[in-house]
Amino acid sequence: MEEFDIAVIGGGPAGIMAAIAASADSNVVLLEKNSSLGHKLLITGGGRCNITNEKPIKKLLNSFHDKNFLKHSFYTFTNEMLLDLFRNRGLDFIIEDNNRVFPETEKSQDILAILKDYLKDITIKYNYKVSDIKKENNFVINNDIIAKKVIIATGGATFPKTGSAGDGYCLTDNPVTDIKYGLVPLITKKDLSDIAGITLYDVVIKYKNFKIKDNVLISHVGLTGPGILNISSEISRNVDYNILDNADVKLDEVLSVDLCPDFNQEELKTKFTNDFQDKGKTYIKNYLKYFLTNNFIPFFLESVEIEGETQLSRINKKQKNKLVEALKNFKFEISAFNKDLSHVTLGGIAIVNINPKTMESTITEDLYFAGEVLEPVGPTGGYNLKIAFSTGYLAGLSASKK
């Protein structure tokens, strides 16, 4: 058997960073079940790699449900420390809207190439799937590797083609929460294929007590875009299911979209009353261009059962109220998650059994966890890579120093 101080399981962002952090003081092996590293990293940000979010740490933490758990790792491995790893190898960064950080080359391959360069003196075993870990005096992995400490960074369960298939959940005695889809496009009950490709800009999406202002992209099967992805995680939290038991989740949820957030309902009613008098000969389909994307108007009018060539002066009070209600609360009935496009896994190894200052299990000594295999998940926009890199670094550092 080969012997190492630390074995890191999983060659994604968290595992790579854990191996880098641990290697300064320890003999490390990185175990990757694929034939190469960083499969999921390569497709993040549409292949451009939205590596982190540049918000100040306090504001960054407020974006997470599990901010108290993440706090120590975020302060231990800051954005500046992360970006300096790449700047020291000649790669700088650009900051785009919503504080999203990308490499200046806009190529995820360049991020991965530098990370691999930091790993050049570390033993890496490819096509190595861990199916068994035994804890004796040390850890025995697949009956052929001995390690004093183990870091599990196997990712989530919702992107199996990249290697994230939930492998890490059953390797230890640490409890696992319900595993759900996160940051996932939504499938609607109504067929939207005729308006696929339309973007609703700067609308307010509402689900129960949660709301967010962002863009909504209409797809052939439903809704996507940053706002939808973020609110999908709230839907997921609200619905009782576990994809390890049943991957096909049926939904009966309703999203409400405020298509005119610059007006409240009374202001819109007043505007309609005045405009319908002053512009009485204008067709409603033309009038709505002031409020809606042009290609969305026929679909919208069909939903309120008003003909597009109806003059404003001929619209009665009931129809006017119906228009106002639809503009302020346009309803989309949701039937399912578009599960094959789930960006992250919601849930994982329960953080109640993890020491947030070290990432060590409180159940099994010398066992650490990092990245998406853990319970926390954040919104879209670089937040989840931030979790991966910071928890990975903290796990690697803690394991090597203990």
What would you call each of these model-derived segments?
Residues 126, 298-377:
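A glycine-rich dinucleotide-binding beta-alpha-beta segment and adjacent secondary-structure elements
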